[in-house]
From Swiss-Prot:
Monomer. In the transfer reaction, the free carboxyl group of lipoic acid is attached via an amide linkage to the epsilon-amino group of a specific lysine residue of lipoyl domains of lipoate-dependent enzymes. CDD domains: BPL_LplA_LipB. Catalyzes both the ATP-dependent activation of exogenously supplied lipoate to lipoyl-AMP and the transfer of the activated lipoyl onto the lipoyl domains of lipoate-dependent enzymes. One of its GO terms (molecular function) is lipoate-protein ligase activity. This is Lipoate-protein ligase A. Residues 29-216 form the BPL/LPL catalytic domain. Keywords: ATP-binding, Cytoplasm, Ligase, Nucleotide-binding. (R)-lipoate binds at K134. ATP binds at R71, G76, A77, V78, F79, K134. It is found in: Cytoplasm. GO terms for biological process: protein modification process.
């Protein structure tokens, strides 16, 4: 029986693809070597320990229907669209070796006519007249008996959108998380006009087979045709949840301030695991009582626009005469944290 396994996803859903990756990684025999090829539609993928409010322009993502997906590996934030090809190599130890998977991808690029080289710990670069340009970034995860290396190849990604979603709003965030380094990147289509996802997948597959000296049939998977993966439904539910994608953010603080016709407002939030652990409100309003009450209500609240609005509007029962002020405050807060 072959020790190789090849899976190719027909789904563009990042939560589906990352859930498949997680299930296979947890359940594969330690003797198996797996290649999983996939791609995502319009998604910002962040590292396991990153803060989405710090890394991403979450407001623009919401406006443009761009998803957020937190992966289980470390590293920085990246934007995925259908101009990217994603790969995951998995193996049990001691077989797992990220230098092997890196060489497989480099051999695949070479077979396509692109001379690339590894740079640093995570990147593949090509040399251009303007200097080195990144065409691939990677991240890694290891447990006691297995490991995986996953990464992205830029084929024809919309690099302007990449900059849009990875340059955050100028929010006053004093975060304990790490801000990603924005790398100089280029698309493979600049070097190989017309190159397709299918061609890249075929080249990586052939390099994978050549390295191990055997071949297997590809398993084509999609939400309608999932492989036999115990606990997949639970893994997908977690991968697609707000609690995982946003709530796992490192602790951070957020300062909001605005001047309204009825007075200035300054809000200080401390946020842990997506919940407000402390809220302070400062104002020169002639009637500060609703704002003081709001500070109490926001303690323990999810750091989410709709939940902040809900808590603010709940104060209308106790402060009906301040309806105009509370609705202005509600709309402003919701816009500021998106």
């Amino acid at each position: 029986m072959s020790t190789l396994r090849l899976l190719i996803s027909d789904s563009y859903d990042p939560w589906f693809n990352l859930a498949v990756e997680e299930c296979i990684f947890r359940q594969m025999p330690a003797t198996q070597r797996v290649l999983f090829l996939w791609r995502n539609a319009d998604t910002v993928v962040i590292g396991r320990a990153q803060n989405p409010w710090k890394e991403c322009n979450t407001r623009r993502m919401e406006e443009d229907n761009v998803r957020l997906a937190r992966r289980s590996s470390g590293g920085g934030a990246v934007f995925h669209d259908l101009g990217n090809t994603c790969f995951t190599f998995m193996a049990g130890k001691p077989e797992y070796d990220k230098t092997i998977s890196t060489s497989i991808v480099l051999n695949a690029l070479n077979a396509l006519g692109v001379s690339a080289e590894a740079s640093g710990r995570n990147d593949l670069v090509v040399k251009t007249a303007e200097g080195d340009r990144k065409v691939s970034g990677s991240a890694y995860r290891e447990t006691k008996d297995r490991g995986f290396h996953h990464g992205t190849l830029l084929l024809n990604a919309d690099l302007s959108r990449l900059a849009n979603y990875l340059n955050p709003d100028k929010k006053k965030l004093a975060a304990k998380g790490i801000t990603s380094v924005r790398s100089r990147v280029t698309n493979l289509t600049e070097l190989l006009p017309g190159i397709t996802h299918e061609q890249v997948c075929e080249a990586i597959t052939e390099a994978f087979f050549a390295h191990y000296g055997e071949r297997v049939e590809a398993e084509i998977i999609s939400p309608d045709k999932t492989p036999d993966l115990p606990n997949f439904a639970e893994t997908f539910a977690r991968q697609s949840s707000w609690e995982w994608n946003f709530g796992q953010a490192p602790a951070f603080s957020h300062l909001l301030d605005e001047r309204f016709t009825w007075g200035g407002v300054e809000l200080h939030f401390d946020v842990e695991k997506g919940h407000i652990t402390r809220a302070q409100v400062f104002t020169d309003s002639l009637n500060p009582a609703p704002l003081e009450a709001l500070a109490g209500r926001l303690q323990g609240c999810l750091y989410r626009a709709d939940m902040l609005q809900q808590e603010c509007e709940a104060l209308l029962v106790d402060f009906p005469e301040q309806e105009k002020e509370l609705r202005e405050l509600s709309a402003w807060m919701a816009g500021a944290v998106r």
